[in-house]
Amino acid sequence: MKKIILLFALMFSVASFAQFKKVEKKESKFTEIGKVQPLGQPVQIVCKKTEDNIYAFSYRDNAYKTLDEYENFYVKDVDNAFDALYNTIIEGFETKPKEPIVLETENQFIYITFVQNFGTLVSLGSSDKNGSERKTHSATITKKQVEKLFGKNK
């Protein structure tokens, strides 16, 4: 009887170790272009690029002060769309539009909002094209931080 109990104990212990399987880390298909982390806070906005020239912007939704919810929008670099987005933002620092600039991608709208608060600041945001009422937006960043985000540091 003792041998049978010992046999069952060994079988269950082996079975419990067999439940886990080590997963090898895959290489990320994204290369980080730039990120904004103002005043030692958690990362606010990150720009990454794939081999397919798709730029992913991941930003902390500023609607929630206590929750860290991150949103994304993607820009395919067709006809220099990435540089056009950068130039649109930089031109906005000069023209200071009162209304948000709305850009349309394949499945999202990108909102670029400029605010005047101790200088000109910009906030990036997005919403789905599928009729979602929810618009998200990032924290406001400076022109220098935009240059860092887009990898245009001089």
Describe the residue ranges of each PLM region.
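Positively charged, low-complexity terminal tracts
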Residues: 18-154
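Bacterial Sec-dependent N-terminal signal peptides
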Residues: 1-22
